[in-house]
């Protein structure tokens, strides 16, 4: 999808970083131009999501995913640099489109 606020074309993906292609997760600037700290937090979220989706996270798998989602949100909200105005609203729209197109995923 195209979003000027996210820096241009980005793959459709959900909050858990999953794409419409089963087993493919994304993180970092491919999901929108943000700080390196946000990219690292997204990488940890993608990893937690993959482990949980594969059934390898045990009883705490979903908890780890939720913690990683909160970490991404916290890191984004406290970023020293915002590269594009309206990035929060654009992410909300992206995640809504994901839900409408692909469902809740995991």
Regions inferred by a protein language model and the residue ranges of each:
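Residues in flexible loops and secondary-structure boundaries
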Residues: 20-21, 34, 38, 80
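Short beta-alpha connecting loops at secondary-structure transitions
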Residues: 28, 32, 102-105
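FAD-site-proximal beta/loop scaffold in flavoenzymes
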Residues: 1-31, 73-74
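Conserved mid-domain beta->alpha element of the FAD-binding
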Residues: 32-51
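Mid-to-C-terminal Rossmann-like scaffold of FAD/NAD(P)H-dependent oxidoreductases
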Residues: 2-8, 45, 49-106
């Amino acid at each position: 999808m195209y979003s000027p606020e996210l820096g241009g074309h980005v793959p459709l993906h959900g909050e858990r970083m999953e794409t419409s292609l089963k087993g493919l997760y994304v993180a970092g600037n491919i999901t929108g131009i943000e700080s390196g700290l946000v990219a690292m937090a997204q990488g940890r979220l993608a990893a937690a999501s993959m482990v949980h989706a594969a059934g390898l996270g045990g009883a705490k798998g979903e908890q780890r995913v939720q913690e990683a989602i909160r970490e991404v949100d916290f890191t984004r909200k406290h970023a020293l640099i915002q590269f594009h105005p309206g990035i929060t609203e654009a992410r909300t729209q992206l995640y809504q489109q994901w839900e409408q197109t692909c469902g809740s995923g995991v």
